[in-house]
Amino acid sequence: MSMSDPIADMLTRIRNAQLVKKKEVNVPSSNLKFAIAGVMQQEGYIESFSVNGVVASKILKIKLKYYDNKPVIEKLKRISKPSLRVYVSNSKIPSVMNGLGIVIVSTPKGVMTGQVALDQNVGGEVLCSIY
């Protein structure tokens, strides 16, 4: 059976791995998940990530980050879902916790944070929020 929301699955795996204090988590890879992991690493929410395996069954290995034995990611929420897509213009990009968190946006220029999308004057689909 196919997965209906692979991005939500990735976020749930990260959330569950952090609850049991795992150092890393394996997720089936895709270009979009790779881009989301790249944004998470740039913003300091994960330590690193790599892709392992052959073409048909690539695995994205995400190394999680902790501070004082607590996960760096406090809340990870999927916003745009297959059942309800959320698209925003550059002026409507939401802020998370008054700028303490980030939103990840898929734009025509690639996957980026909401702040970068605002700076580049592009809108897109709001994938998730992290703080």
Swiss-Prot record:
One Gene Ontology term from the biological process aspect of the record: translation
The record ties this protein, via InterPro entries, to:
Ribosomal_uS8, Ribosomal_uS8_CS, Ribosomal_uS8_sf
Q: Where are the transmembrane segments?
A: none
Extract one GO cellular component term from the record: ribonucleoprotein complex
Instruction: Specify the superkingdom.
Output: Bacteria
Keywords of the record, alphabetical order, are:
Ribonucleoprotein, Ribosomal protein, RNA-binding, rRNA-binding
Q: Per its record, what are the GO molecular function terms?
A: rRNA binding; structural constituent of ribosome
Q: Offer one Pfam family short name for this entry.
A: Ribosomal_S8
The UniProt subunit note reads as follows: Part of the 30S ribosomal subunit. Contacts proteins S5 and S12.
Q: Which family does it belong to?
A: Belongs to the universal ribosomal protein uS8 family.
- Report the function annotation for this chain: One of the primary rRNA binding proteins, it binds directly to 16S rRNA central domain where it helps coordinate assembly of the platform of the 30S subunit.
Under the heading PANTHER family, the entry gives: 40S RIBOSOMAL PROTEIN S15A
List the protein's name.
Small ribosomal subunit protein uS8
Species in which this protein is naturally found: Vesicomyosocius okutanii subsp. Calyptogena okutanii (strain HA)
Gene of this entry: rpsH
